[in-house]
Amino acid sequence: MSRLPIELIEIQFIHACNLSCQGCATFSEIKHSGYSTWQQIETQLEPWLHRLEPESIGLMGGEPFMNPRLEQVIMGIRERLPNTQIRLPTNGLLLLKKYRIVEMLKEIGNVTLKISYHLDDPLINKAIKKIMNDFEFRPVTEYGINRWLADNEFRFQINRPTTFMKSFRDDYADMKPHNNTPTDAFEICVAKRCPFLFEGKLFKCSTAGLTPWILERFDNPNSDLWEPYLNAGLSPDCSDHELEKFLRNFGKPHAICRQCPSKYDQDSLLDHRKLVTKK
């Protein structure tokens, strides 16, 4: 079978973050250590590249600019996938300190640099101003998203989230799934089209991929309640039928979505602006 197109594959390559945002989709508000190298990412990604042709690769944190191997990872992806767009999210706090990476992104092209604007911080505001002054942008709207576009397909985007959705009930030591209908949970999902690669397996989203990992870290609380949501990842040696089924579900509800909140779970819909702090 020829390689199948997929819109996006997100890759978790650092868990640590310099902010603590309650309800973080990748559980990065708690303390983490370590990071992934390009060699480790390539080992996970390569088996899938024999079967899938990603339009975009997203490098997820944590805070990606905290990974000391970020430049090597970016160049590794560009060399292996010269026609694939690289999406790089950041909270912006380290952009000025590591501005050479911003310049590199412009040089290699076909990149989207996205600031998730969590704080009204001078470092972030100065970085935004510098980027806007250093490159000749024109405003564009792509897939309903407002961005700035420069030559060499360099895109710059700023998101200003106001609500974070906590993907589980109670605290980490007593995590419980929401057990909603897939349709109700998917209705407010912010990761509707974000397949996620973690530990070699492909998941519907970061929550599906990282929940078993974070449960294990906290000694698997309420394991009986979580049983339906475990082992949800697709292995690269899956059958053609399994892979095609996964791709057909792209952008649609799935049984795994039941673990997440719906609009009726107001305790899990957090005012992000009041619940973000620097670490």
Spans of features found by a protein language model:
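Accessory C-terminal segments flanking Radical SAM cores
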Residues: 169-279
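Soluble or luminal CAZymes and related metallo-dependent hydrolases
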Residues: 5, 36-40, 69, 123, ...
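Conserved alpha-helical substructure of the radical SAM core
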Residues: 1-90, 95-100
